[in-house]
A protein has these predicted regions:
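Short loop->beta-strand "edge-of-pocket" segments that line small-molecule binding or catalytic clefts
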Residues: 8-14, 30, 116-132
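Soluble non-cytosolic domains of exported or imported proteins
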Residues: 27-35, 60-63, 125-129, 151-155, ...
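Short, hydrophobic alpha-helical packing/hinge segments within bilobed ligand-binding/sensory domains
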Residues: 36-37, 64-68, 157-160, 166, ...
Length: 200
């Protein structure tokens, strides 16, 4: 209804969720989810028989994406948001477009092979994500005494890891591989650890 009435859809995108939705070097939003979202916009335009449907792009974070959909600030969110029962009670989801496991990114020579190796160490994850919730629960349940750092986005999480302020970055494996690919020396890094969840 909003698209038909206004001729505009506001699309929420991520700034650093490689390979799903992120800025390229020219500050254009690109990625797998972004491409799918633009196809969905074309579908809406055709279904509503609109001659023109404008789009407005708005950056969102893991912490605010659900709220911005709920309050109508954005019409569609395009990123790597996990479709789970808790979130289905809050917002609607498209059909599944990816399946991932939650793992660790660390330096190859860090000695970190799996989650038990994180006991007593600094670990970073991105605020507002399923990974953050899982990591905090693991820390409490297993009394691992990790110092958990919650960064604002995946780029900041990787920077925290890269600068040595954390020994590992816990996140969806596809996103970890994306961060690893853009590193100065991708060969210095490894995605490791038993997947803590399988998510879509």
């Amino acid at each position: 209804k909003k698209a038909k009435d206004t001729g505009v859809l506001t699309l929420g995108h991520r700034e650093s969720s490689i390979p799903f939705s992120y800025y390229n070097d020219q500050q254009q939003v690109i990625g797998y989810s972004q491409e799918l979202m633009m196809k969905a916009v074309e579908g809406v335009k055709e279904n509503l028989k609109l001659a023109k449907l404008d789009t407005k792009l708005m950056p969102v974070t893991s912490a605010n994406r659900i709220t911005l959909v709920q309050n109508g600030t954005i019409d569609i969110e395009c990123g790597s948001t996990t479709n789970n029962l808790e979130r289905q009670k809050q917002v609607g989801f498209s059909t599944t477009i990816f399946v991932i496991g939650t793992r660790l990114l660390t330096k190859k020579d860090s000695g970190i092979k799996d989650f038990p190796d994180l006991a007593g160490k600094n670990v970073v994850t991105t605020a507002g994500t399923t990974s953050e919730r899982l990591l905090r629960k693991m820390n409490e349940d297993k009394q691992m005494k990790m110092n958990i750092i919650s960064a604002k986005d995946h780029g900041e999480s990787f920077l925290t890891l890269e600068t040595g302020r954390a020994v590992a970055f816990m996140m969806d494996d596809a996103l970890l591989y994306g961060e690893m690919a853009k590193a100065k020396k991708p060969g210095d890094w490894i995605v490791t650890g038993t997947a803590q969840s399988k998510e879509a």
